[in-house]
Amino acid sequence: MSXDEYALNKQELKALIKELKKWKAPATVLLSLYIPPGRPIPDVVNLLRQEYSIAQNIKLKRTRDAVLSAIGAAIDRLNKIPKIDGNGLVLFCGENFDTEDFKCFMFSPPDKVPLFFYRTDKEFHLEFLEDMVEDTAVYGLIIVERDEATIGLLKGARIEILEEIEGFVPGKHMMGGQSQRRIDRIIDEMYHNFLKEVGEKVNAYFMPFVQNGKMKGVLLGGPGYAKEDFYKEDYVDYRIKNLILQPLIDVSDQGEVGLREMIMKAEDLLKNQQYIEVEKLLEELKYHLAKDDGLIIYGKEQIKKAMEIGAIEAIVIHEDSTDKELEKLAQDAENYGVKVFVVGDEVPEAEWVKKTFNGIVGKLRYRLY
């Protein structure tokens, strides 16, 4: 039995990540193991046996038993596989302290395992998998004014706020003479220092995405001239500056509201970006629902039948859905040429999709009746 027989697709992996994020432990008893393709299984098993011997010295009985069970389960499963091929292998083993259930998940992810990693911790280490299920293209988001800034990311249909920054930069004084010039210099220095602080934070947040080639562009906006000053001066790394899309965008608000406004105003710059597509589709669904023109469809069975005859153009699914049939519909949709958009609470209409349509709604190519 090879690792390929345990392969998960992206939709299945996304559902598993969601489940594993719920697992927490009061002690370091949850085992995470990443094995890249080609790694000899005997080497991995020998390492685990050494860890098993060390774990026998843990003083607390329940912690000791939980760690030994996790390592033992991992060894048992690896001994059933002759080699690690395909994209490699990932194992998560441990006891759920809330339910007292013990489980061991072993699978081959949709992309290659990037490194060998072993750890027992209070939670499963999922960070190496999360990039596999997210859109590869990421857009940086910056809103800046004299004494406020918001830094965020646009990942697929999700807006993620990284930090909201507040400074103190007073307005210009009208005292006259040398006192005015001195105060103006102090204010200018405070303004420069604030923009410098914003730039340093932007570099810290964005450079990892730039270095791994995932940042496709950066939107820069704000209500006044600060965005122009921020762009003209070297407040950010030149590699980030080269990704700033033109023109800069006039935005009236900070925070999530401001980021949404900036994204929608940048529609022409973000052609075919998933967030824009989702917002447009949701507006179309509302329009067709209001017109009652027969171009909106909901209900699992109705959507399934319409999909099988090629009548559906796109479907929207709420990410919190735990219905296995909905997950299967989403997996099958691509085979029928249907666009699938998974939305979460960061999209304002997500709750509407969840409550009004039980988590799934579609747009038809043509009327069925």
From Swiss-Prot:
It comes from the Archaea. One of its GO terms (cellular component) is translation release factor complex. The keyword Transferase does not apply. It holds the Pfam family eRF1_3. Its main location: cytoplasm. InterPro entries: eFR1_2_sf (IPR042226), eRF1_1_Pelota (IPR005140), eRF1_1_sf (IPR024049), eRF1_2 (IPR005141), eRF1_3 (IPR005142), Peptide_chain-rel_aRF1 (IPR020918), Peptide_chain-rel_eRF1/aRF1 (IPR004403), Ribosomal_eL30-like_sf (IPR029064). Keywords: Cytoplasm, Protein biosynthesis. GO terms for molecular function: sequence-specific mRNA binding; translation release factor activity, codon specific. Belongs to the eukaryotic release factor 1 family. PANTHER family: PEPTIDE CHAIN RELEASE FACTOR SUBUNIT 1. Heterodimer of two subunits, one of which binds GTP. Directs the termination of nascent peptide synthesis (translation) in response to the termination codons UAA, UAG and UGA. HAMAP family: Rel_fact_arch_1. This is Peptide chain release factor subunit 1.
